[in-house]
Amino acid sequence: MHTVFLGTSDFAVAVLRRLAASAHRPLLVVTRPDRPRGRGRRLGRPPAAVAARELGIEVLQPPSVNDDDARAAIASARPEVVCVCAFGGLIREPLLSEHLMLNVHPSLLPRWRGAAPVERAIMAGDVETGVSIMRVVEALDAGPVCARRAEPIHRDDTYGMLAPRLQRIGGDLLVEALDDRPPFADQDDAHVTYAEKIAPGERVLDPARTPAELERVVRALTPHIGARIDRDGAEPLGVCAATIRADVGDVAPGELSTRDGALLFGAAGGALELREVKPAGGRAMPAGAFLRGHAL
């Protein structure tokens, strides 16, 4: 089947590679323009652009996928299906009506429509998530679904552990959908939840929340975004790994303290033990190493 692929992020790359290894190898990859990256703010290519060039697939990076030139380039490839995964840009009419578009979305729709479904599933304490293949429509992640597959969220899963499993499922499920062309079923609007983009303030661990809630925030934001503790009169402290210490009740909410060599952060009804931290401007390290070189 002739396909075109729209994708940008690292998540999209794994799906692109699986698609390229199938009978539905894309004739064209459309991704976002290069943008400044890192501390030096040098222009860097999107991961999908790098992967497409490695695979020998033509790459298009238009200012907007909806402009006339981009639409003409996609049409010239004569795709039977346009495959979308983590593209990061709005797809509008008339492009939507010009092609059948299938989106790889890392949640069990209609739960967690939106920009951060993997993070929100971990934060909410969901015991499972998954991948859905849906037809792209104008409304956000609201199109009918033709395939879905569940994946458990393990007790210690971070984003960095869960996302690769969902990438593999997404690639396999997309290829299966292209092979088998299963029927579409509308989503149940009564069960819709939204996965809003992670706001900067959500990175900060709020001591008014329970240790269990904070531990899930740490896992959901590790390693790509990162949780942190804001400290009065000191640089913020990144938190890369933590465990719940409900047995500790004498650490005030918001207080950083030590007990028997453990670094603790007080929260509502208990404490969070910080196992791995990242000082401002430094590298991640075990909490014990941090305590040996830094004063609280």
Regions found by a protein language model. Name each.
Residues 2-5, 29-30, 38-47, 51-131:
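Active-site-proximal cofactor/substrate-binding loop regions of enzyme domains
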Residues 7, 29, 52, 174, ...:
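Residue-level signal for inorganic ion chemistry
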Residues 1-39:
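N-terminal Rossmann-like dinucleotide-binding module
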Residues 13, 17-21, 72-75, 93, ...:
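Amphipathic, non-transmembrane alpha-helical secondary structure
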Residues 176, 180-231:
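Active-site-lining helix/loop region of Rossmann-like oxidoreductase modules
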Residues 208-296:
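An anion-binding loop in the catalytic cleft
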Residues 81-195, 199-200:
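Donor/substrate-binding cores of folate-linked one-carbon enzymes
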